[in-house]
Amino acid sequence: MVTLTGHSLTVEEMKRLLFEREGVTACPDSMQKVAECREAVEKIVEDGKVVYGITTGFGKFSDVLIQKEDVKELQHNLIQSHACGVGDPFPEEVSRGMLILRANTMLKGVSGVRPLVVNMLLELVNRNIHPVIPQQGSLGASGDLAPLSHLALVLLGEGEVFYKGKRVHAMIALTEEGLEPIELEAKEGLALINGTQAMTAQGILSYIEAETLAYQSELIASMTLEGLRGIIDAFDENVHKARGYKEQIEVAQRIRNILQDSKLVTKQGELRVQDAYSLRCIPQVHGASWQVLHYVKEKLEIEMNAATDNPLIFDGGEKVISGGNFHGQPIAFAMDFLKVGMAEIANISERRIERLVNPQLNDLPPFLSPKPGLQSGAMIMQYAAASLVSENKTLAHPASVDSIPSSANQEDHVSMGTIASRHAHQIIQNVRRVLAIEMICAMQAAEYRGIEEMSSATKIFYHQGRQQVPSITNDRIFSTDIENIAHWLKTSPFTLERLNVNATL
């Protein structure tokens, strides 16, 4: 059980919440802050004060005063009118993450909702009722209005949910779980939909998958080094300490650990003086991608615990301030950076694939074919990898450099952060398939070199991989092999810890 406080949620906790479906509870002290802030909102309504989002319309309608008797209708209208998402739904993990993050931001006690609203969000999480939320339609400021409106519909007993493996109307799930839909009161509709939880939840999922892939890429690259009789001297710690980047030093250390008892890697001058960059510069390139991952994680953990609502309520209602914390620019930049960092792992992997299959670049059978000429072997696998990395270059174009004014130019600059986050996840799926292709080719090369000569770590990895796909003894439909390895890398992440390889120094 993870206790939400509004200020201490971590990516590691989100891993458990999203993938192990661990439950959540609210910190009592934080809930007390929620209750106190709610009292301030009710006093504002009772006194008839003009406060944006509480007693006024929204966006360009901020100068329209709402009568006390119309406040509840205002909130309901807001949710229904803003539920304009389109396209395929987000994965359930993202939907679940949005519920958790929205509850966590409310627990900061500056949004003005009743504790009832927070409790309803937590009930949905704990009962695995996940809103069906279309992926497209958010500008990333005022936050993720459309996606979060689809989330909010479920609290009202409207919209659809994923429940017990099916896509059903929200009321079916609520009724089966004995939950009553709620009626939103002043400020609560706006507090539910004004924020960056869609881009952040998708960003968390993307980061978690990217981190696992980054480790797996080092194992796969190590196996390629063996298949190509790579020079281990390039990974000497003196080389990497001379440059000074922590992440580069750590990648070199991990690869030395992985290959420490390999009989296939060579010494400088043994077969050749130096390797091509895609082998020699693995620590420099993969290390730079780790720098990106560290940056992204830092920004995500700030945003996970941020108040991204508007307006925010301070000092018992004495200060109700309209700000712009809903603007997704920090996450938009982080997601665009993640796109570039992960695309580069695929770029260098594709070049290693080329070195594994090109007979002009190695002494292996052409295209790793068992019968060159009669059988094409891995020839078209490299085509597939080239296509995937080329697609990544298009997806890696920064979404955050774009902005389109909305709400009659009241919201005249937006982040496009959710587009960046979605594209980051698409890139990561492509990267995984490129790495799957490299792994298939590296395993085949290792067989030609001699499996018994591999390091202890790569030998284990090889045998695990061979449980997913057989050796290439004849041409076959290799698409199936690629998807099988990619699925295995995603669902059964083979970690460095399982190979007794230190993840960090």
UniProtKB/Swiss-Prot annotation:
EC number of this enzyme: 4.3.1.3
GO CC term, one of those recorded: cytoplasm
GO molecular function: histidine ammonia-lyase activity
Pathway the protein contributes to: Amino-acid degradation; L-histidine degradation into L-glutamate; N-formimidoyl-L-glutamate from L-histidine: step 1/3
Positions carrying 2,3-didehydroalanine (Ser): 142
NCBIfam families: hutH (TIGR01225), PRK09367.1 (NF006871)
UniProt name for this protein: Histidine ammonia-lyase
Organism: Bacillus cytotoxicus (strain DSM 22905 / CIP 110041 / 391-98 / NVH 391-98)
Lineage: Bacteria, Bacillati, Bacillota, Bacilli, Bacillales
